[in-house]
Amino acid sequence: MANEIITPTEGELKTIIDKTAAYAAKLGESFENKVKQREGHNAKFNFMKEGDQYYPYYRNKIVENKAKIQADAAAAAAAANPKTPSTTTTTTTTTTATTPLPTATATTTSPTPTTSSTIVPVPQTNSTQQLQQQQQQQQQTTPVFEKPQPPPPPPPKKEPTQPDPLLYILDVPDFMTPLELDTIRLTAQFIAKNGDSFFMELASREVKNSQFDFLKPTNHLYEWFRALVESYAQIIYPPQGIKEQLKSNYFSNKQTILERAMNRCEYNQLKEIEEQKKEEREDEEKTIIASIDWHDFVIVDTIEFNEDDLDDLPQPRTFDQLIAGDTPFGGSDFDNDGHGSNGKGGQDMEMEMDMEMEMDDEDNNNNEDEIEESSLSSTNTTGNLPPKDQSKLKIVKDYQKSNSSVKSNAPTKLTQLCQFCKQEIPLDEMQEHMRIELIQKQQRDSRLGGGGSSNNNNNLTNTLTQDDDIARNLQSFASKRVDIFGETESSKKQDEQPTQAPKVIWDGHSGSIPRVQAAQQAAQLAAQQAAQQKAAAIAAQQASQQQASQQQQQQLQPPQPIGIHHHPQRHLPPGMMPPGMMPPGMMPPGMMPPGMVPPPPFGMIPPGMVPPPPPGLMIPTAPPGLMIPPTQQQQLPPQTNTSPSSSSSIKVEEPQSKKLKIDDVLIPESVWLQNNPNPVNLTVEMADKSNIYQITLQPTDSISLLKEKIKELNGMPTNKQKLQAPGLSILKDTCSIAFYNLKSLAIVTCGQKKKGGKKK
């Protein structure tokens, strides 16, 4: 059944099989491979695949067509070269066929009967020769059907090599319009002919023209444009010997040109196949990655932990122990003796380890008797340890444990940095150290260069300190000797930098959670108190500075006597006026004499009148025996000097008093809560005086809760409310009632925020 040939029915499929077999027999396996690559996905060409039902029929048709081609070739060759002996043989065969055979058989086979009884016998020799010739002629004329030989194996397929680059053929981008193509081609021709100078001029002149954007290196058509320029340049200015190269066999032989074209085609196809396979591999990888269930898992092994396994382990160390460097020794020996990791067992082990280290240092100085005594004492003191550890322990008598944490009371020596060895040397040893360093330097220089006069001079110049080193040394010396040079700016900055509070870190144990929380709360409270104290100190300093400036101003303007409106010019001789003053009769209408102030309009405070001074300011009193008029008691002393400097000083001082902030002098929130723990009844007054509300809150409640209460009463959104208390700035939502020191019956004004306006 495997070799059974199934003939397809008459139709399109049979026609395709017959034509394909005919071409395959004529062109060989290369044609079959190309058809398989090109029509591999076509179902009509499945007969070319092994295992198909029509594959044996297809192979048989190929064999038949090859045999037919060979027979036609042999016949054509015979017709081209005719032979004369073949014609003679055919004539002899026809004549011999008509001659009768000898003996009686000849009489019986004769076509015409004879009447005579006598027959002329034919010679035997001639008849045998004719029979042999007839047999030879029949053998020559009868066609011999030989079994067709299989075709020779095709030559090994040649791998395609990388072809030469195409210098004069460029692929035109698909997205390019005909106008852009013509513009780029014409520009490339001119640039290839005229050079880069023309390119630079054209690019600078047409920089704003959108049609010449391809001249910019950032454009997507710039690379294609440069390749086009290079191609045109090679055509306009061809290389030397190009004509002889074109006349060579490499370009004139058609077979060579065809092979080169086939190589380029196969190379391009191979590249496309590789790119396609690469894309398929990438798609497969993406598909595999997308199909992975990242939440899936497989149990490899199960490890069971029993409570008995934890008995031999030491107790977990806390964060403080890790920082302190304590290493608890937990083991079965100490547990059996009843010593914990932090108990006596750990101390004994630590002492024994220190003894062993000390003994190793003094091993060369001890005698054998001392070693024996120490070994005996070690066996007596360490009876609880295993025997294998007793032989290693060495105890020194009169041992004193060195404590690195205890600082020596000896006074610290002053040191100085050596410029040669870069080490801190005591001042009393500095001279000897420098002498040794200089000697060593001279010896080293003499070994290297063999010392001469020039070398000595160089050594002397090298030992001198440079200017920048001198300045640096003096600066460091001044920073260390504050008692001589005073405090420098760097030391002040270091002192002003606040010390960073230790970070509160949880060690992971559940038992230390309350301690960590308490430490964190204490740190936050301390930071808040420090900030409030700093703000209060700054506010107090500002208030004291302002009070001092106001007192200084009042001292510069002492109160005048009763005749405050009278000027010193009254002591001049009669009939004389001070310079720049006109007589009263010659004053223009509406003007008052000097020293006289016109009365202010009704309802306005005179210019000299000011509100009562703030608390803490002292109003200067008149000298003994003088009385200030009642209208001048709440009036600051007038300024007799009318120069611009005096007026400008008053204008500078007024905004400073207006911008005085009271938020900085508030009592800390924690202190306020301790003194006022009761609920607070606030009076909320609308800015337009329309409504007044009474709201009761706790001192710890925030301002945002107060806004919610106001929203419930009048419906105003919380983000539109602007709350302000007397003497305070706008109340912030995140702060509490106690933060602003609001007591009961305090008045809070509720206004509406305005967007887009200038801040006042």
Curated annotation (Swiss-Prot):
Bias kind Basic and acidic residues: ranges: 487-496
Annotated SURP motif repeat ranges: 16-58, 183-225
Gene Ontology biological process terms in this record: mRNA cis splicing, via spliceosome; mRNA splicing, via spliceosome
Pfam families: PRP21_like_P, Surp, ubiquitin
Record localization: Nucleus
Gene Ontology cellular component terms for the protein in this record: catalytic step 2 spliceosome; spliceosomal complex; U2 snRNP; U2-type prespliceosome; U2-type spliceosomal complex
Ranges of Low complexity composition bias in the record: 77-147, 374-385, 454-464, 544-557, 629-649
Coiled coil region boundaries: 259-290
UniProt record similarity statement: Belongs to the SF3A1 family.
Name under which the protein is recorded: Probable splicing factor 3A subunit 1
Species this protein is from: Dictyostelium discoideum (Social amoeba)
